[in-house]
Each structure stands twice: as C-alpha cells, then as structure tokens.
A protein has these predicted regions:
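Juxtamembrane intracellular "pre-TM" segments in multi-pass secondary transporters
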Residues: 2-16, 219-260
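Helix-loop boundary and gating motifs at the non-cytosolic
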Residues: 5-67, 254-262
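Central cavity-lining transmembrane alpha-helices of secondary-active solute carriers
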Residues: 56-81, 100-101, 168
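Cytoplasmic membrane-interface "Motif A"-like loop-to-helix N-cap segments
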Residues: 81-97
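C-terminal ends and interior cores of transmembrane alpha-helices
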Residues: 92-113
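Intracellular juxtamembrane helix-capping segments at the cytosolic ends
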Residues: 130-145
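Helix-loop junctions on the cytosolic side of multi-pass membrane transporters
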Residues: 142, 178, 211-229
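Glycine-rich segments within core transmembrane alpha-helices of 12-TM secondary carriers
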Residues: 153-179
C-alpha cells in the first residue's frame, strides 16, 4: 500500500481556529467536571441527601460511567470519523451536546431531589467533551506535516491550559469569590445556587464562542488521503485503531504522543 501523503501546510488562521476549540473545551471541563459544578453538587445540592450513598460517592459513580462510555466508544468513533465530512459532523454534534448539557446545569437548584439530574448532566457533558476530542485530534492530520505536528499540537495544549486558567479566574472573580448573600463582581445571589448556575451559562457560552471558529472553517481544511465511508463493527473499530496507531507511529511519532497525552 502507498504511504499516505502528508497534508500540505495551512494558514495560521486555521491553526488558531483549531487551537481555540481546545481553549473552550478544557475550560469547560475545568469548571463543570473538576472545580465548580461538581463541588456545587456534592457540597450544596446534595446536602441533606437521605440514603446510604453520599453525594461524593454518587459523583464518583457518575464520572466512572462517563469514563467507561468514552473508553468503549472512543476507538469506534476514531475509525468512523476518518472521512473528513464525518469528522466535521461528529465534532459539531458532540460540541453542541456538550454546550447544551452545560447550559442545562443552570437548572439544577439547591435541593437533593436535583442531585441525580445534576450528576447525569455532568456525566453527559464530560462524555461528550471527551468524545468530541476524537474528531478534534484527528483534524491535526489535516493541519500539519510530520515536521509541524509537534509545534501545532503544542499550541493546542497551551491554548487549553490558558483557557482553563482564564475561565476559572472569570468564574471565581465574577460569580464565586467573596462572602455574604451575593458573590463576585457581578453580585449574583447565593440563594438557591444562582451564582453557580449563572456561571454555568457563562461556561457554556465560553465553549460555544471558542468552538465556533473551528466549526465554521473545518470544511476548508485540506482533506488528507484517508479511507472513505465504510461500515465498521465495534471489534473492527478497535482492530483498525491499532493498525492506524502502528502506521502513524512509523509516519509521525509526535502525533501519536499528542494523541496519548490528550486521551
């Protein structure tokens, strides 16, 4: 079989659009999964929960379900999105689901009856965001050559780091910091979790804003010489993934390193 030709170099604007998606996605995960919404669920919404399981243990189960879902579906997703148009559609759908589920977390009130719904939305957001990274990472092959993949992937990683720090600062300063009945520079009421719920809307808007440039320009990326549409079984997806990783290791090890770090 012929080796796949390297993708031609692309303009800076397309690389920036690609990196901005990571800026939005990593920020969303930091707020929803790690630092703000998860703490709101276990420390506020779940207080007074009756029954044997604690809010923290229920959170662990929700994250385990999300992680298992990603572990099962990510390899198959990676094979199914090898065709560039499928890649774009999958990225748009999964990004949209992550934005919508994050927006819906603003409906979770300070009441133990809302805990299960909140955990379900958190798990859905985490799973969709992680699965969206599969077509996102695959787009790197359309943007880079073996010589530039390390630099471009590093830019994406840096954008994600900066995005998470910037959004954390925005949410803390604007909605969380301080004491009393209102919090943050915007003075949002703490009662019924309004300050955290407002921060979730800002987080959803953040991801949507930074994802938009990539979603609008992905169709202009140079199509790499990759397999077209085909039906693949779950086991076939894992087999194809292993074959692709071995082939990519021979072609461009920097890209494989980036995919492993992003996993």
């Amino acid at each position: 079989a012929r080796p796949r030709p390297a993708s031609p170099p692309v303009g800076r604007s397309k690389v920036v659009a690609w990196a901005l998606w990571d800026c939005g996605s990593t920020g969303l995960n930091a707020i929803v999964v790690t630092f703000v919404f998860s703490v709101y669920l276990t420390g506020t919404v779940g207080q007074g929960l009756t029954g044997g399981a604690s809010p923290a243990s229920l959170l662990g189960r929700a994250l385990a379900i999300a992680g298992l879902t990603v572990a099962v579906l990510a390899p198959l997703t990676g094979v199914l999105v090898q065709a560039p148009h499928r890649r774009r559609v999958a990225l748009a759908v999964l990004t949209g689901l992550a934005v919508l589920s994050t927006s819906a977390t603003s409906l979770i009130r300070v009441d133990p009856e809302y805990l299960v719904a909140g955990l379900a939305l958190l798990a859905l957001t985490a799973a969709c965001s992680d699965l969206a990274s599969v077509p996102y990472n695959a787009m790197l092959r359309q943007l880079s050559t073996p010589e530039t993949s390390g630099r471009i992937s590093g830019l994406g990683w840096a954008a994600g780091y900066v995005g998470s720090v910037a959004l954390l600062l925005l949410v803390y300063v604007g909605f969380i910091g301080g004491s009393g009945p209102t919090r943050g520079l915007f003075g949002v009421a703490v009662q019924d979790g309004h300050n955290v719920r407002a921060a979730m809307l800002v987080t959803a808007a953040w991801f949507a804003l930074f994802a938009l440039p990539l979603l609008l320009t992905a169709h202009t990326f140079a199509p790499a010489a990759e397999p077209g549409d085909r039906r693949v079984s779950l086991l076939g997806g894992y087999s194809q993934l292993w074959s692709d990783l071995r082939a990519e290791w021979q072609r461009d090890r920097n890209l494989v390193y980036f995919l492993l770090v992003s996993a």
